[in-house]
Design a protein with these regions (language model features):
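Hydrophobic transmembrane signal anchors and adjacent membrane-proximal interface regions, especially
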Residues: 7, 91-95, 102-106, 118, ...
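Acidic, Ser/Thr/Pro-rich low-complexity intrinsically disordered segments
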Residues: 9-99, 126-127, 136
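Generic secretory/membrane-interface signal
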Residues: 90-93, 112-115, 144-148
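N-terminal leader/pro-regions and domain N-caps
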Residues: 1-9
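C-terminal edge strands of extracellular/lumenal beta-sandwich accessory domains
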Residues: 57, 119-171
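Intrinsically disordered, low-complexity regions
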Residues: 14-16, 21-23, 63, 113, ...
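Signal that preferentially marks extracellular ectodomain short beta-strand elements
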Residues: 22-25, 103-124
Length: 171
């Protein structure tokens, strides 16, 4: 894990969190970092009050949009998700910089060993600084006699590097 935590983010605010692979306690010699995976988890904390909230649907919260962007050197990815009222919601951002179709096919016909390595080995490109931006667009629309308040959201994040182990065996 590159990092994880919880942030309370105000409406229309973007926070920036930085991570570095130098802070990872590696459990193996494998440093072939070929991607990054971010999981953002959030719920709805909109409140409503007033006599009109008893009307069907009047106290229903409006979905908020949570956007995450992860960046490492020239590699980046952005994904948005929305909370859906009760319970928690989440979405994932996955950025990879290796030939995953070659890896998952398990077959590299008509390729030399060095060509295969060029497609699967990051050659250190995954080491170093990573940045995660999280933005919240909180929505709260008042109904007749039912006032809604939604100024921020609590967002949990988990950032993991994707390691690739592979072995090249002649056919």
């Amino acid at each position: 894990i590159l990092g994880n935590g919880t942030e309370y983010i105000n409406d229309d605010e973007t926070i920036l969190i930085d991570f570095n692979t130098n802070n990872i306690e590696w459990t193996s010699e494998n440093r072939n970092v070929v991607g990054v995976r971010v999981l953002l988890t959030y719920s709805e904390d909109e409140t409503s009050n007033g006599a009109g909230c008893a009307a069907p649907g009047a106290s229903q919260p409006d979905p908020d949009t949570i956007t995450g962007t992860v960046t490492h050197d020239d590699f980046n990815g952005t994904t948005s998700g929305q909370n859906q009222g009760q319970g928690s919601s989440s979405h994932e951002i996955l950025v990879e910089w290796y030939n995953s179709s070659l890896y998952f096919s398990g077959n590299a016909t008509n390729m030399s060993e060095s060509e295969i390595k060029n497609e699967l080995d990051s050659d250190g490109a995954g080491l170093g600084l990573y940045f995660l931006e999280i933005n919240v667009e909180a929505e709260s629309n008042d109904q007749l006699g039912c006032n809604h308040t939604d100024n921020d959201e609590e967002v949990e994040y988990s950032v993991e590097v994707v390691l690739l182990n592979y072995e090249i065996t002649p056919a």
